[in-house]
């Protein structure tokens, strides 16, 4: 969870704004209401861990891999700490590149609005992911291995679906895709390609690390793309009353 929160914070870090010659098309608004939405999403994302959710212990340790869908069985293996760490590093890179590509060099009103939209996307993706983990309560791959007994006491091992890393990475990439299309930001094709390749890399590393099943990262990617599309699509612009 701490790595996911850290990745969210990196995604929200601003890049320095510099003067521009022309006004952007339909800049997003940035108001105190946006700050409220970001704060609410961030608070909701931290609430499950604060409340010690999910409650209860594992019914099986180890669990039977035969109960898994065929597409997920091959992902059952011991946790790889190196792949786990690499997935967080790549996620931080995706978040940083999103901020750089979507904020740098813009006039103040556009920069502030884009920052607000990115922040709302990140906070509500994190909140949605954390609560879905609690509701779905799917076991991580480690609970199907010989290391299940030692891992069973960690509540986080009951929170496999959806993948928070995948959700945040694809939310960042998709929010930039939508925003750059509306505002005709420079180098859009290159940046979109890099961001989606990075997001796919994050997802692959989560499976390689045995932190998630393939269906977990697919669910996370779908969730992230949905929120990444929705927030910048409905975010009000300065031209709106």
Residue ranges and their predicted role:
Residues 6-14:
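Bacterial N-terminal signal peptides
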Residues 44-49, 124-129, 133, 202, ...:
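Alpha-helical transmembrane segments of multipass membrane proteins
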Residues 21-97, 133-156:
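N-terminal transmembrane-helix/juxtamembrane module of multi-pass inner/ER membrane proteins
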Residues 97-98, 120-137, 188-205:
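Small-polar-interrupted transmembrane alpha-helices in polytopic inner-membrane proteins
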Residues 1-5:
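Bacterial N-terminal signal peptides that target proteins for export
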Residues 17-22, 110:
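Boundary at the C-terminal end of the N-terminal hydrophobic targeting segment
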Residues 8, 145-241:
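Membrane-embedded catalytic cores of phosphoryl/pyrophosphoryl-handling enzymes
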Residues 38, 104-128:
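Interfacial segments of alpha-helical transmembrane regions
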């Amino acid at each position: 969870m701490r790595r996911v929160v850290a990745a969210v914070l990196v995604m929200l870090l601003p890049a320095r704004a510099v003067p521009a010659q022309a006004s952007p098309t339909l800049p997003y608004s940035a108001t105190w209401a946006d700050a409220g939405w970001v704060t609410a999403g961030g608070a909701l994302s931290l609430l499950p861990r604060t409340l010690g959710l999910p409650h209860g212990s594992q019914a099986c340790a180890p669990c039977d891999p035969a109960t898994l869908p065929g597409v997920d069985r091959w992902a059952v293996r011991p946790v790889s700490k190196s792949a786990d760490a690499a997935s967080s590093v790549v996620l931080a890179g995706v978040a940083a590149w999103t901020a750089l590509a979507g904020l740098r060099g813009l006039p103040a009103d556009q920069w502030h609005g884009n920052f607000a939209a990115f922040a709302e996307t990140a906070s509500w993706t994190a909140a949605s992911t954390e609560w879905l983990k609690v509701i779905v309560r799917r076991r991580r791959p480690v609970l199907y291995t010989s290391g299940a007994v030692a891992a069973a006491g960690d509540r986080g091992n009951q929170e496999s679906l959806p993948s928070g890393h995948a959700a945040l990475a694809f939310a960042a990439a998709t929010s930039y895709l939508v925003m750059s299309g509306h505002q005709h930001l420079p180098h859009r094709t290159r940046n979109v390609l890099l961001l989606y390749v990075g997001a796919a890399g994050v997802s692959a590393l989560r499976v390689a690390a045995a932190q998630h099943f393939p269906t977990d990262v697919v669910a996370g990617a779908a969730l992230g793309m949905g929120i990444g599309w929705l927030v910048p699509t409905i975010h009000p612009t300065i031209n709106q009353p």
